[in-house]
């Protein structure tokens, strides 16, 4: 185990409250999440149908791609059978509200939940402070052992901007929800192309809020969907928002590479170099890149890289990035330093992919306690 990871885990171990002090040792107040909303259908692809009751699963995304390549080479059409293994609410607001609600926070959800609110959101989040701006997206999440394929109908988040947010919810009303909150989480730029206009609007609004959140957590999402011109045009909005509050941007390994190429030019770079290039371009307080093998955080204190405990047979990988962000947000509220915060993000995501379930605060603490033993 590398010394950098050992130091990060030691810092997390020292800064995170002990299990017997949880949850009371963390100030679990209001948290606000916007501005998406999805209905996720978790699916698997059939490789071979044995009989009406049994089949073999197509296990890898590579194998899925090979079948497509062979079909293209043969100039032939192709069909797949897929099966739905479950369904749930999804997106940034749902996943983070679910996690923070389980940790005894008071989530405020402002996003796309339907009009009237769809039964799935009402059943799960009806006791939360939930406000719908429009229709949710629908995602078919196909799970493979080596990755996942997400097929998405975006919903009304695609057309959301600062003016539309005012019309659908109200800027003054949003300011009231943010007053006294400990965190604002936003996602995803990839599904809300005009999200930078909301960042600029928040910057102007911030001074009118008596007690605004100390941190805004930004998840850009799968920015491969956005062209380079849009990425470059929107980047300064994050730096402008960071002038009035701490902005923490969190992307996965692939997304970090796309952002680095857009801002620093196409090049072969390491994960760390990509993260540093994005930090220099966006000018947030922290930039965090999370990956399967390592997670990286760039801050005014420098760059830290933390190894991630691998899992050979994950129960569920869809939304692992959102769970990383939930852990990161928890660490930000608890005041952890950058490397330690990344350890907590890895812990929440690591628990989730191993169990397909939400960790309690005690579970998070236990994962940190055993972090080095999981390698």
Question: Where in this protein do the model-derived segments appear?
Answer:
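Glycine/charged-rich beta-loop-alpha catalytic/anionic-binding loops adjacent to active sites
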Residues: 73-84, 301-313
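Alpha-helix C-terminal capping segments
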Residues: 97-106, 331-335
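Ribokinase/PfkB-type carbohydrate-kinase core domain
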Residues: 1-71, 83-88, 92, 103-107, ...
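Short glycine/serine/threonine-rich phosphate/pyrophosphate-binding segments
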Residues: 91-95, 325
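Short, conserved phosphate/pyrophosphate- and ester-handling motifs at nucleotide-, phospho-/glycolipid
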Residues: 100, 252, 321
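Membrane-targeting and insertion segments and their boundary/processing signals
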Residues: 66-74, 315, 319
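Conserved post-catalytic alpha-helical subdomain immediately downstream of the catalytic base
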Residues: 309-375
């Amino acid at each position: 185990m590398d010394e950098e990871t050992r130091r990060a885990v030691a810092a997390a171990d020292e800064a995170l409250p002990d299990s017997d002090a949880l949850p009371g040792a963390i100030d679990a107040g209001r948290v606000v999440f916007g501005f998406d909303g999805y209905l996720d259908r978790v699916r698997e692809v059939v490789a071979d149908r044995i009989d009406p009751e049994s089949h073999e699963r197509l296990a890898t995304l590579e194998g899925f791609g090979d079948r497509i390549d062979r079909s293209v080479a043969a100039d032939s059409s192709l069909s797949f059978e897929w099966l739905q293994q479950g369904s749930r609410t999804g997106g940034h607001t749902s996943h983070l509200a679910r996690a923070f609600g389980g940790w005894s926070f008071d989530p405020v959800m402002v996003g796309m939940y339907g009009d009237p609110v769809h039964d799935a959101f009402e059943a799960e989040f009806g006791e939360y402070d939930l406000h719908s701006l429009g229709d949710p997206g629908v995602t078919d999440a196909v799970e493979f052992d080596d990755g996942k394929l997400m097929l998405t109908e975006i919903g009304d988040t695609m057309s959301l901007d600062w003016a539309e947010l005012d019309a659908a919810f109200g800027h003054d009303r949003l300011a009231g929800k943010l007053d006294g909150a400990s965190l604002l989480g936003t996602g995803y730029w990839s599904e809300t192309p005009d999200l930078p206009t909301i960042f600029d609007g928040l910057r102007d609004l911030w001074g009118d809020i008596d007690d605004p959140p100390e941190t805004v957590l930004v998840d850009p999402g799968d920015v491969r969907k956005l062209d380079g011109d849009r990425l470059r045009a929107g980047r300064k909005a994050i730096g402008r928002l960071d002038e009035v509050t701490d902005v923490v941007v969190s992307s996965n390994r692939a997304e970090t590479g796309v952002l680095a190429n857009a801002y620093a030019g196409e090049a072969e770079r390491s994960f760390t170099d990509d993260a540093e290039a994005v930090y220099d371009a966006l000018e947030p307080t922290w930039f965090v890149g999370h990956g399967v093998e390592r997670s990286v955080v760039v801050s005014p204190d420098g760059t830290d890289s933390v190894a991630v405990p691998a899992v050979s047979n994950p129960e569920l990988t869809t939304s692992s990035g959102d769970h990383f962000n939930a852990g990161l947000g928890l660490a930000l509220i608890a005041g952890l330093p950058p490397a330690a915060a990344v350890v907590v993000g890895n812990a929440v995501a690591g628990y989730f992919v191993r169990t397909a379930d939400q960790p309690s605060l005690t579970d998070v603490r236990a994962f940190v306690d055993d972090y080095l033993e999981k390698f």
